[in-house]
Amino acid sequence: MSEATWWYRGGTSKHDLHYRREAEVNTTLEELLLYFIFLINLCILTFGMVNPHMYYLNKVMSSLFVDTSLPDDERSSFRSIRSITEFWKFMEGPLIDGLYWDSWYGNKQLYSVKNSSRIYYENVLLGIPRVRQLRVRNNTCKVYPAFQSLVSDCYSKYTVENEDFSDFGLKRNPEWTHTPSSRTAPWHWGFVGVYRDGGYIVTLSKSKSETKAKFVDLRLNNWISRGTRAVFIDFSLYNANVNLFCIIRLLAEFPATGGLLTSWQFYSVKLLRYVSYYDYFIASCEVIFCIFLFVFIIQELRKVNEFKSAYFRSVWNWLEMLLLLLCFLAVSFYAYCNMQSFLLLGQLLKNTDSYPDFYFLAYWHIYYNNVIAITIFFAWIKIFKFISFNETMSQLSSTLSRCMKDIVGFAIMFFIIFSAYAQLGFLVFGSQVDDFSTFQNSIFAQFRIVLGDFNFAGIQQANWILGPIYFITFIFFVFFVLLNMFLAIINDTYSEVKADYSIGRRPDFELGKIIQKSCFNVLEKLRLKKAQAKEEKKMQTTDLAQRARRDGFDESEIQEAEQMKRWKERLEKKYYSTEIQDDYQPVTQQEFRELFLYAVELEKELHYVSLKLNQLMRKLH
């Protein structure tokens, strides 16, 4: 084999390079097919956990416990209460009426006291509800000396350091004594504080009258006082019609400024996983998912062992590792939630007169849903790894990589100005406008300004001079100047990339053309394409030769043209596409000689045409 047949960089022969190319194509197609099967299985698994009834169950429970009007005040509900008096009205009215459904139409008895309540006649109240209070100690804040004679008591905001652990009030019942928090229980993030488990717990009864009497007793003995900072109402429901649990938490916060803030959480989750035939089909998809996870982990370990440190230089490999990590976390959360659900349901069946802490399960189940949602997001993003062989996607990736430095520099300048305006808005309007009440809210408010969703009247009313100045200058510098600079950077770089591609720069191979070429090869093997191509080629050659004879060319010129055509066809056959080719395709000595002779003949023809044009121009003059 001559030396010219070896690739100068790696000494790769023509045959080896072709074999490597075909192997890379086959590997890519196999990996794409396998990944699509995994993605379809993941979609079935993910959407199989979501039930449209979840929204409607949350909606109906929200309307019952959050939007029901208070007694003697149709304009107020749990959503809008702002005082302790209104809170007790809610506890003794809409809450009790919503929890205890003891009669059917016409006052027909619906259930006995030993059984659970059926909310809306379809949702079983699991166990008994629980009311929990968190308090802070007196004298937990510092009072200015001049006001110490006027202020004898001082209750600060809720923190773990300020929390009150001592008994208070009557001190004879559990609701007046402190219950330690569980280390594994999740914390709750409210409007004005972050609250942990434990506190002063009131366990309700299955009897509506007993529960109402207990609420009246707590109200008369000031169970909620100045030291109260949060009251939680927790209970859980189960709807067998749709096999869904609804875990409900109503929260009333009593900030140190006075007043009352309410919030709520409704979690509809499917804790009993395998009930119907469709559930068992989802279970089979879960098994397949675990098999895929095991196979992908083995593949990535082999790649790491083969490429060593070079493996970590690819962005797609980092995405692959992130995807595997998320899949592993999803499997771990799923196993933990199922195990805890089994244990908790067993305890509930043994003792129906206790409070079942399903909020703990809902908390971890929501984390599982979030992890699986992020997993499927990155799983779809990974498709770009395969379609990046397309010319358009290659141009997009080249554009982003080429303008990355400019984008980073622009981002630094943008966030400096953006942060400056956010601090200005927070300091000027924070005490009067809800959108600027915190620094985080100020940042989101500015993004809303960019999107055109903003209440200008609010900042104008807060400060009629600085409000319009802030708004106009922010729109001018951020919206008209900076965002257009960003678009100009992207547009200019994309134009450069388009120009590079127009003069011959292409991706190594395009997936669409590879699939098209594979289909053509199959058709040729089936003798559906090959015969037709030969027929057209023969007819085209015959027509050209006959036309040349009619135009007066002699046989030597015709034979020379046919020889040049054969050389051209041989080169085109080897380099079948300018869009799918290697940057270092090997050329043999014979091919180089034919290419050189072809170029010489083209130069002669060009010179001949130039002389003819000169003669024609002289005749015209």
From Swiss-Prot:
The chain crosses the membrane at residues 32-52, 278-298, 315-335, 361-381, 407-427, 469-489. GO terms for cellular component: membrane. Glycans are attached at N115, N138. Residues 1-31, 299-314, 382-406, 490-621 are cytoplasmic. InterPro entries: PKD1_2_channel, PKD_2, Polycystin, Polycystin_dom. It comes from the Eukaryota. It is found in: Membrane. It is a multi-pass membrane protein. One of its GO terms (molecular function) is calcium ion binding. Pfam families: PKD_channel, Polycystin_dom. Residues 521-551 form a coiled coil. One of its GO terms (biological process) is monoatomic ion transmembrane transport. Expressed only in testis and heart. Signal peptide: none annotated. Residues 53-277, 336-360, 428-468 are extracellular. Keywords: Coiled coil, Glycoprotein, Ion channel, Ion transport, Membrane, Transmembrane, Transmembrane helix, Transport. Interacts with TRPC1 and TRPC5. Exhibits a lower single conductance but no spontaneous channel activity. May function as a regulator of calcium channels or a channel component involving Ca2(+) homeostasis. Belongs to the polycystin family. This is Polycystin-2-like protein 2. It comes from Mus musculus (Mouse). The gene is Pkd2l2.
